[in-house]
Regions:
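Iron-sulfur (Fe-S) cluster-binding segments and ferredoxin-like electron-carrier domains
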Residues: 1-4, 34-43, 71-80
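Membrane-interface junctions of multi-pass transporters
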Residues: 1-33
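Local cysteine-cluster metal-coordination motifs and their immediate loop/turn environment
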Residues: 23-35, 61-71
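Canonical Radical SAM [4Fe-4S] cluster-binding loop centered on the CxxxCxxC motif
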Residues: 48-50, 55-87
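Radical SAM enzyme [4Fe-4S]-AdoMet core and its adjacent flexible, acidic
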Residues: 57-59, 78-87, 151-289
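Short, conserved loop/helix-junction motifs that constitute active-site signature segments
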Residues: 98-100, 126-130, 151-156
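Distinct, well-ordered alpha-helical segments
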Residues: 117-124, 145-152, 215-216
Length: 289
């Protein structure tokens, strides 16, 4: 149960790694929060007695097979992985039904919430309570079709993140295998309208790599077009799915296109803080100052 997990010795041990300021179980090369901190001067606060945030990663089913994420399609609608996901979703919802304190539930870190039958089940069954808010990360291709089926989640949405690794039809459809450029734009327009109605934060996520680094400014313009609050430009990580990661790793100083990448990165600096409302954040990219 959730109560057993939260009160376990393992939970306390992991929490102690934050309490003592070492963050020894965290990856400081990938965590955007740690990258932005100088831990020599950071004094962590004592852990809260009540849980205020839960991040769900209980199903890796997705309607895309992006080269930066996986080698083949992963989709569960039966079998042991699916059954486990449903059981976990039910246990979490049972706990939320009785939880009295403000909490935010993040849906989708491994698969797509609107493609996944497990996450759909979770959203269908999640309790309607004023203390529960949500955040979602999605590729957005199925958002317009399925968001109306979970109106309570959308009404209580704090933040919607959309992963999109191309700013043109050619690049998008090359890197988001299974996606269509016209479909993503239709959904981005719908999200922009829904944001005005419900007031959630809208974040676009862009994994920078050899095949799309030349469109960094274009994705910023796309974000502006659809009223995004932020465009996050993130470094591509090696998840052991690339046979040619070194070729794609534009961040390697020895890469033949690295200098061009650095020059393009410099050119988008004005979007990062010189506007009244900067739109771009680069938590895992290196910008020369």
């Amino acid at each position: 149960t959730m109560e057993e997990i939260i009160g376990s010795d393992m939970h306390k041990h992991l929490q102690s790694a934050i309490e003592d300021g070492t963050y020894r179980y965290c990856n400081n090369n990938q965590c955007s929060w740690l990258i932005g901190q100088d831990l020599r001067y950071f004094k962590p606060s004592k852990p809260r007695h009540k849980i205020s945030h839960i991040r769900l990663a209980i199903d890796d089913s997705c309607n895309l097979r992006c080269p930066s994420c996986r080698k083949s399609m992963i989709f569960h609608k039966e079998g042991s992985a699916y059954n486990l996901g449903i059981r976990l979703a039910d246990k979490i919802n049972d706990w939320l039904h009785n939880y009295e304190h403000p909490i935010q539930v993040h849906i989708g870190s491994d698969g797509d919430p609107f493609a996944s039958h497990v996450y759909r089940h979770f959203m269908d069954q999640t309790p309607e309570r004023d203390n529960i808010k949500y955040s979602i990360l999605t590729n957005a291709l199925m958002f317009k079709d399925f968001a109306p089926r979970v109106p309570y989640v959308i009404r209580n949405l704090n933040e919607l993140g959309v992963s999109i690794d191309g700013a043109t039809k050619e690049t998008y459809e090359k890197l988001r295998l299974g996606g269509r450029w016209e479909k993503i734009n239709e959904n981005l327009e719908y999200i922009s309208q829904l944001k005005q109605e419900h007031g959630f934060r809208f974040i676009m996520h862009y994994v920078v790599q050899k095949e799309n680094y030349h469109e960094m400014e274009d994705i910023i313009m796309l974000g502006k077009k659809y009223n995004a609050d932020r465009v996050w430009l993130n470094k591509m990580e090696d998840w052991n799915v690339f046979d040619n990661f070194k070729e794609m790793d534009i961040f390697d100083p020895e890469h033949p296109l690295h200098l061009d990448y650095q020059e393009r990165l410099e050119s988008i600096k004005p979007y990062m803080g010189f506007e009244k409302k900067p739109i771009v954040e680069t938590p895992t990219l290196n910008i020369k100052r």
